[in-house]
Design a protein with these regions (language model features):
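Membrane-embedded alpha-helical segments of multi-pass membrane proteins
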Residues: 2-13, 35, 47-64, 112-120, ...
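Membrane-interface loop/short-helix elements at transmembrane-helix boundaries
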Residues: 173-186, 269-308, 313-329
Length: 406
């Protein structure tokens, strides 16, 4: 456990450096997302470090924009789609309050402002990218956060293995420095999946240049925590992402991937093998398909257009991001959500057609595979709605938008 003075000290230093240059604040956000973003102290309960830094970054960014007389929102292909998703979220909250389907207006607006925070993170990262050096700075920041997070995972499970009742020791979520257990292991694993795919794509794109070793190390170190999270959706998403990378961009690595698929399972502990055997359609129907059916039955009779309102129930109620979006924001919100995801993939594809630098291509390829992986993981999880994986997704997507703007 870290002392409280260190927690506050890191937050203050990140805030101070932000006023010098916004990229320092974005670096602080990327690392805070990766390590332990939620703290419980005597002064503040459940304080998220990146939220504190986000306020400082936004204020510094706002002042910089006013000083330079630049438009607040940088132009990206996703601006209108982001505006549409923010609009549908706001409408769902307002109508949920008016119709009485939203238990608390505070919870509704909290969820909407968190969405706005993600949009601002996306725009600030995209706006800060002015050169290849900026891309490398922010990319390394994101990867350092993921490496630190992976190290925590290794400490919690792999290095402190216990055979008591056949279960490993530790909470293994790399989420809270102190206080009760935080997020589920599958949310932690989904965060690592996206970063692992970015690291793998960047390593393959840079190979055989010396710079390929760092992203390769990132990808390698994240695999063990992902596997030992026992998250079937995260493991399936990782496999889909790897096959997306090899099938679309790096076919020369496909034989190596296929060989690894044969060798690695034989090396896994029996406990993990049993968990992986649960990756089946029958299991999915029993454990997850009910969420879709429940969302339709509970939403259509009440308010099919805008749903019950953001935050009316926890994510565990429907167990996947699509049913949750339908129930919370209705058909209109689901359309906005899917349109935004399609826009992300389209932007990434356009960017790949415009850039030739192997470093830039590696990042965009990894983000493309990560987006596909999150779409698949969303069938039985909430990677694009849960805080930590959604933050890393929009950080990297903002970097792709910045590359698109170069």
């Amino acid at each position: 456990m870290l002392p409280n003075w260190l927690i506050y000290g890191v937050a203050v230093i990140c805030g101070f450096l932000t006023w010098r240059d916004v990229k320092w604040g974005l670096t602080g956000i990327a690392i805070a997302i990766g390590i332990s973003p939620e703290y419980r102290t005597e002064f503040a309960k459940d304080l998220r470090l990146e939220d504190f830094v986000m306020v400082a970054v936004f204020l510094a960014w706002l002042i910089q924009k006013a000083r330079d007389r630049e438009p607040l929102i940088p132009f990206t292909p996703l601006n209108r789609l982001w505006g549409f998703w923010l609009f549908t979220g706001a409408i769902s909250v307002l109508l949920g309050i008016a119709l009485g389907t939203l238990p608390s207006w505070k919870i509704g607006f909290f969820h909407w402002f968190k969405r706005l925070e993600l949009a601002l993170l996306f725009w600030m990262v995209a706006d800060r990218v002015r050169s290849l050096a900026d891309v490398k700075w922010l990319a390394v920041s994101g990867m350092v956060g993921a490496l630190l997070s992976s190290y925590i995972g290794w400490q919690q499970k792999w290095l402190k293995w216990s055979d008591t009742n056949g279960e490993p020791s530790g909470n293994y979520n790399a989420y809270k420095v102190s206080g009760p257990q935080g997020e589920k292991p599958n949310v932690y694993a989904q965060y690592l999946v996206f970063n692992a795919l970015v690291g793998l794509a960047l390593a393959w794109s840079l190979h055989p240049l010396p710079g390929s070793w760092f992203p390769a190390a990132l990808a390698g170190l994240t695999v063990v925590p992902i596997l030992f999270s026992f998250s079937r959706s995260a493991i399936a998403a990782l496999l889909v992402g790897i096959f997306s990378l090899t099938g679309v961009f790096h076919r020369r690595w496909l034989p190596l991937v296929l060989i690894a698929m044969v060798i690695v399972p034989s090396m896994l502990p029996s406990l993990l093998k049993e968990r992986l055997e649960g990756l089946s359609w029958e299991r999915f129907k029993v454990e997850r398909l009910g969420g879709y059916i429940a969302a339709v039955k509970e939403t259509l009779p009440v308010n099919p257009l805008t749903g019950r309102g953001l935050g009316f129930a926890g994510f565990n109620r429907y167990e996947n991001q699509y049913a949750n979006t339908l129930a919370r924001e209705g058909i209109l919100g689901l359309i906005a959500f899917l349109a935004l995801l399609w826009g992300v993939l389209k932007m990434q594809n356009e960017t790949l057609q415009m850039v030739g630098d192997p470093y830039l291509r590696g990042i965009v390829q990894g983000c493309f595979a990560g987006t596909i992986a999150y779409c698949i993981a969303g069938l039985s999880g909430v990677p694009l709605l849960a805080i930590r994986p959604s933050e890393t997704f929009w950080f990297w997507t903002g970097l792709c938008a910045g590359i698109w703007r170069l």
